[in-house]
Design a protein with these regions (language model features):
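Second-shell loop/turn segments in exported
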Residues: 118-133, 149-151, 181-195
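Alpha-helical segments in soluble extracytoplasmic regions
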Residues: 96-144, 255
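N-terminal glycine/threonine-rich, aromatic-flanked beta-hairpin/loop signature
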Residues: 236-275
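Long, amphipathic, charge-rich alpha-helical segments that form helical bundles/coiled-coils
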Residues: 154-185, 189-194
Length: 323
């Protein structure tokens, strides 16, 4: 979503001093229509009419044209109630949790044309909040249903994890995108885009737990084999150690590794193609192997050190909490 919002805005990214993009001034009428299409894989029949078949070609276009744009588009309008109504509609209209998560994407599509109309950094910051709100609303809805159906032991376990996730998400966002001072007026856009990403991921985690209770089949989406943010939180709401793998500004694959009470290092990695990433610190003092285990976290093993390295050869650290 961040790429969509940044399209066409090469200038105007200076430091406007916009720290808070959560402004929600309600205008007289919503600029987004109520229609959201649904995907229902369980109820598909082979006896669809010719008319339905012909209309299939137009499905995507109707999904993407639910927004009325005009010269006075109000980016400060509070869409929270509109989004909640859309999410409730998706929940009641989806045949399974798998379909539900797919249909939430149609709400994202519904707001995309309006977000693409943003011309200034402030408008981009404000509109980026909508997509985070969509997944945050879905996550809360999923949690409410999970809480109602889970047995006490399961609920206690997942509740502890959820509280830890909530407690850490601000810190991991800062670790991933940096501070406001580093990013200037783009900070709210970067913040909302990353919160959207990790909240969507968390929605899938809770949906998976709910599916187990309901006896539904549910397939988690594949996580990147190279990039992600993983932490060791010692079963608390604090980040003790962290591993971030991402693509740098110049296209290089970089990793930031911080180990509790030892130190941190930054460097680049090469994908060996066997599920392992070969890491070398920028100063050459640390070499090691990163293993990304998808939703189950990641690990880092130090294979070689030289000089005044912050880590010891043979040391291995696990980062079991995946964001």
């Amino acid at each position: 979503m961040i790429l969509i919002l940044m399209t066409g805005l090469c200038a105007g990214c200076g430091k406007e001093g916009v720290k808070n993009n959560n402004t929600g001034i309600e205008s007289e009428s919503s600029q987004v229509e109520d229609s959201v299409s649904f995907e229902n894989t369980e109820d598909t029949e082979d006896t669809e009419s010719t008319e339905d078949t012909e209309s299939t070609e137009n499905t995507e276009s109707t999904e993407y044209n639910d927004v009325v744009l005009n010269e006075e588009t109000d980016f400060t309008y509070d869409y929270s109630e509109d989004i909640k109504a859309d999410v409730d509609n998706v929940v009641s209209g989806s045949a399974s949790l798998q379909d539900e998560l797919k249909n939430i994407e149609n709400i994202v599509k519904k707001y995309t044309p309006l977000a693409q109309a943003a011309q200034t950094q402030t408008e981009m910051n404000l509109s980026s909040r909508w997509f985070f709100d969509i997944w945050d609303t879905e996550l809360n809805n999923l949690w409410s249903r999970f809480s109602d159906l889970a047995d006490p032991q399961t609920k206690e376990k997942i509740l502890a994890e959820q509280r830890n996730w909530i407690a850490m998400k601000e810190e991991v966002t800062l670790l991933h995108i940096g501070s406001y001072e580093e990013n200037g007026s783009m900070y709210p856009l970067l913040q909302n885009s990353y919160l959207e990403e990790i909240t969507k991921n968390r929605a899938y985690v809770i949906a998976n737990e709910l599916a187990k209770i309901k006896g539904e089949s549910f397939v988690m989406p594949e996580k990147s084999a190279k990039y992600g943010l993983f932490v060791d939180n010692q079963w608390t709401g604090s980040v003790y150690s962290s591993l971030i793998t991402r693509q740098g500004l110049e296209g290089e694959d970089e990793a930031l590794i911080s180990i509790y009470r030892e130190g941190e290092t930054k460097g680049t990695f090469v994908d060996n193609g066997n599920g392992e990433l070969a890491f070398t610190s920028d100063d050459g003092s640390v070499k090691g192997t990163i293993k990304i285990n998808g939703w189950d976290g990641a690990s880092f093993k130090v294979t070689e050190t030289s000089g005044e390295a912050v880590f010891s050869a043979g040391e291995e650290v696990n980062f079991p909490f995946a964001f």
